[in-house]
Amino acid sequence: MNKAKIIGIDGLGGSGKTTFSKILQQRLDHAKLFHLDDFIYPKSIRYDQNVSEQEAYYNKQWRYDYLIQSILKPLKNGLPINGLIEFYNKENDDYEEKQVMIPAEGMIIVEGVFLQRKELRDYFDAVIFIDVNKEDRLERVLGRDHYIGTQDEILKKYESRYFPAEDRYLEEYDPVHLADRVLSAVNSRLEREVNDVISFIENRSSSTR
């Protein structure tokens, strides 16, 4: 029985995961793209005042159980998805249901940080890690994350919340070596790296039939 292929695009903040994943989706017929940030907890949980910023981000940011039970586990077990799935709406800090249909033999791409944590890793058929140094990532987020505030406020947020949690992930999981493929996703090599990933996915799919 052919089962769905579940591809993870892992990487730290500002590494280019979303851009790469969108291009990859466009090149893969019928693949559906899910963003891990569509499955975050509301602010009251992910900004829990009883723990540090980095602890809240690392352990209280995402609804792993919901993602697993509603999407990853059924597909991994050879079942189709045909129903309403809750997606986070940042405008009202709540969830809205959307109809999702994925055939049992379909393909999905999940992009987000920390995808190789023990909660998720075994559900992926392959994980691509986008490895970009901190200086380049910081330059990107300073020019992108204006919703946080000024550049000083963005830097403060990353230094108190995101970077410490990312360092913990790197130490606990060594995602560069755990991943099936490691890419740089720089613009000059982006097309070539997308082609490389597509070939890798196709070869892996052929070998598991």
Language-model features, listed with the residues they occupy:
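Conserved nucleotide-sensing/catalytic segment adjacent to the nucleotide-binding pocket
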Residues: 45-91
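ATP-dependent NMP and nucleoside kinases share a basic, alpha-helical "lid"
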Residues: 94-147
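Walker A (P-loop) phosphate-binding loop of P-loop NTPases
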Residues: 14
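Extreme N-terminal, non-catalytic leader segments
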Residues: 1-7
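Hydrophobic positions on the alpha1 helix immediately C-terminal to the Walker A/P-loop
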Residues: 20
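Conserved lysine of the Walker
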Residues: 17
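Short beta-strand-centered segment that lines the nucleotide-binding/catalytic pocket of NTP-utilizing
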Residues: 30-44
